[in-house]
A protein has these predicted regions:
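Anion-binding and metal-coordination hotspots
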Residues: 3, 72-85, 95-496
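Basic, short loop/linker segments at the boundary and entry of helix-turn-helix/winged-helix-like folds
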Residues: 23-66, 71-72
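Short amphipathic alpha-helical interface patches used for protein-protein assembly/oligomerization
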Residues: 89-93
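Short secondary-structure boundary/capping segments within folded domains
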Residues: 18-21, 53, 221
Length: 496
């Protein structure tokens, strides 16, 4: 039967906002999982105690921005429009129906001029600390990767610029080891002349709209100005750290500041899982020397097309020579400034070699083989990737760090940014990742009853008996709660 409802939009009603928000709403879960009054401790030094106009509650300002990032709203203007009309949003920030929400410019001004990078970092760490206290973090293995964020800059508005080449962070250590290696081989060490020569420059393309962004062009991606978010997460997809750089900075270059942050906050981690972009001599050396393991993937050798395969050249550690496919020795020649030992063949042997065309096209009939002084650490990573434990860890990358990037872009609006400048984009990314961690924390807090200790104690037991979990990965906790059993099974543990 057709029913035509009469519209009565002017009717007066008494409404209890508490009853209008469902008990299983996401914002209720987040509000129950964490105490937002902690934010007052982070911002109290930024306000005057006895002077000035009354401010908007800083907790309200942070809750508004968290709403924007949790629901992937594109701008603060749109966010405040939604907050004004959405009952759940009003309940979350504590504003009744008849109270006007803050103007979007007030929120924008505070996050641009009052709440600095330190404040945002405190909030990011506070959310992670809350998750750690509940036992949700599993930092035994850390997954590292980078993803690009399209900048608010037109590719056509660009200009060429000569910028000085930045020295590598490990340049001093490499220089010392190169000289030590040269002295061991009877060569004269290099002189330190970096202070005498002006720094080398390189030509690059800079956006006239956002000069701090960088050109990004990789694979099938369209060329654009972008930023790069170098990120680390744990086994439960909690984001542990992020370092934002221009889009033209390689992953291996940005690894050091991110790894410093991880070592400072999570020194207990044992394994770093990363793709081939991080499989460099310096990164391998740093991770293995710190007593940890780098779990990475196979790297296709960059050899000559239709030439000898890479494994046909064998390094003889005893004689410090390289044996070529025709069983001739390439003897040590020198160690260059980049840290590579050069092994060269004898020209008279190469002239009569039947496979010279597959080996070298040098006019001098001389084959040069390069081997880094830290190559042994790369070989350690290559050996470790064949172990079953680390092979399985690497297979989890697509479910961990790649899933974090997919959720951030598809559900939380991180595909492109409307902010300009490295500092603003960094704060924007950290707040977005804090919101994602908060969302996960809220879901876990509400889905697991306080009496169910399976999930919360899993990490504590794994930390104490980690060696047994490495040998028997099927060993887990006996928890009969339905939700907990599902979550523990998702994490890779058995409940029987």
């Amino acid at each position: 039967m057709l029913v035509k409802k009469a519209e009565d939009r002017g009717q007066l009603e008494f409404v209890n906002l508490e009853n209008m928000v469902p008990q299983d709403h996401l914002l209720r879960k987040i509000d129950a999982a964490i105490d937002f009054k902690k934010i007052y401790e982070f911002v109290e030094d930024l306000y005057c105690e006895d002077n000035g106009r009354p401010s908007v509650d800083p907790v309200v300002l942070f809750k508004i921005v968290l709403i924007q990032h949790i629901y992937g709203l594109p701008s603060l203007r749109r966010t405040l429009e939604e907050v004004s009309m959405n009952l759940a949003y009003r309940w979350f920030i504590g504003y009744p129906l008849n109270e006007a929400v803050p103007h979007f410019s007030t929120v924008s001004y505070n996050f641009k001029h009052r709440f600095n990078h330190t404040t945002v970092e405190h909030v990011f760490r506070w959310v992670l600390k809350s998750a750690a206290e509940e036992g949700y973090l599993d930092t035994e293995a850390i997954f590292v990767d980078g993803t690009h964020i399209k900048a608010s800059a037109n590719l056509k508005k660009q200009a060429g610029k000569a910028v000085p080449k930045q020295a590598k962070r490990y340049a001093k250590e490499l220089f010392e080891e190169v000289n030590k290696d040269r002295e061991e081989h009877g060569k004269k060490p290099f002189s330190e002349d970096s202070g005498k020569k002006p720094p080398e420059e390189r030509e690059t393309v800079v956006s006239t709209t956002d000069p701090e962004s960088g050109i990004f062009h990789k694979g099938e991606h369209k060329k654009c100005f972008a930023y790069e978010a170098h990120t680390a997460c744990d086994k439960h997809n909690f984001i542990l750290g992020v370092h934002v750089t221009p889009g033209n900075v390689p992953d291996s270059t940005a690894f050091d500041p991110l790894y410093d942050e991880l070592c400072q906050n999570y020194p207990e981690h044992k394994t770093v899982v990363a793709d081939s972009a991080y499989k460099t001599p310096w990164i391998c050396k740093r991770i293995f020397e710190s007593g940890r393991v780098l779990s990475t993937c196979y790297t296709r050798p960059k050899t000559k097309e239709k030439g000898h395969p890479w494994w046909a050249y064998v390094y003889d550690e005893y004689f410090d020579d390289v044996i070529c496919p025709e069983y001739h020795a390439l003897h040590y020649s020198t160690t260059n400034r980049d840290g590579y030992r050069e092994y060269k063949s004898r020209a008279y042997l190469c002239k009569t070699c039947p496979t010279r065309g597959m080996c070298t096209e040098s006019a001098k009939c001389e084959k040069t083989f390069l081997r880094h002084i830290w190559q042994e650490y790369v070989e350690m990573a290559e050996d470790i990737r064949h172990m079953a434990v680390y092979r399985e860890l690497y297979r989890l990358r697509k479910e961990k760090i790649e899933r974090v990037f997919a959720d951030a872009k598809e559900k939380h609006g991180m595909r492109y940014t409307q902010y300009r400048g490295l500092a603003q984009v960094t704060n924007w990314v950290k707040l977005k990742f804090a919101a994602m961690n908060l969302k996960k924390n809220g879901h876990l807090e509400m889905e697991l009853p306080p009496s169910c200790t399976g999930w919360r104690q899993t990490n504590k037991i794994r930390e104490k008996y980690s060696c047994y979990f490495d040998i028997f990965p099927f060993f887990g906790l006996a928890c009969t709660h339905k939700t907990c059993s599902g979550l523990i099974a998702t994490a890779g543990f058995s409940t029987s």
